[in-house]
Regions:
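Short beta-strand-to-turn element immediately C-terminal to the catalytic PLP-Schiff-base lysine
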Residues: 133
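Short beta-strand/strand-turn micro-motif
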Residues: 123-129
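Conserved alpha/beta cores of soluble small-molecule-handling proteins
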Residues: 1-121, 137, 143-199
Length: 199
């Protein structure tokens, strides 16, 4: 049976971006199980720690929310990315099955993470959406592996612009940022010369 995840940042007792997570969870359930009722996260939240950053992990499926955990979170530093080609990968929904991503991640060699290239277009790392800076604007791939909740928020705020970004266009960009529900905007940034093709 298909199972999916929402990973939510809890920052000093504040559960972040619940509306975006709730919308994606219910959109996913409607896609796979059209008759499924909408769920509200508020009814499933555990006791929330009042200090520090925590990862709230919600596993759900056809029958609703199945598992909720809340654990301390530490950002894993990323200082280099291996560009990995994977034309057939599909991770449009945040599934518990990450086996395809894990196989690609295992090919990273000495680099910290991977940046997946699908049909010549940049998509995402193994865990995060990306944005690249051209000196004036932050562009995020129009067709990422997964349309993350932080990505949706940044697009709604006008901070990001969607654009197809081809690998050969990388010299036009100076900086890449990684972000997701747990990694805030500006928290993970590196120069584009830290991206290395591994084909």
């Amino acid at each position: 049976m298909c199972r999916f995840i929402e990973t939510i940042r809890v920052d000093c007792g504040e559960v972040r971006n619940t509306a975006y997570h709730e919308r994606r969870m219910n959109d996913t359930r409607t896609h796979f199980w059209p008759e499924s009722p909408a769920l509200q996260l508020a009814g499933y939240l555990p006791a929330i720690p009042g200090s520090g950053v925590h990862k709230l992990r919600i596993v759900y499926g056809q029958n609703g929310i199945e598992e909720v955990t809340c654990t301390p979170y530490t950002l894993r530093p990323v200082r280099s990315l291996a560009l990995i080609q994977a034309d057939d990968i599909d991770y449009a929904c945040k599934s518990t099955d990450r086996s395809a991503l894990n196989r690609l991640f295992a090919r990273r060699g000495a680099y910290d993470d991977i940046l997946i290239v699908r049909r010549h277009l940049l998509t995402a790392t193994s865990i995060a959406n990306i944005a690249l800076f051209d000196g004036s604007h932050w562009h995020t791939p129009q067709h990422p592996l997964l349309k993350g909740t932080k990505r949706a928020e940044l697009l709604d705020k006008g901070i990001l612009t969607e654009k197809d970004i081809r690998m050969e266009e990388l010299p036009a960009y100076s900086t890449i940022r990684l972000f997701n529900a747990m990694i805030d905007w500006g928290e993970a940034e590196l120069p584009t010369d830290c991206l290395h093709p591994v084909f």
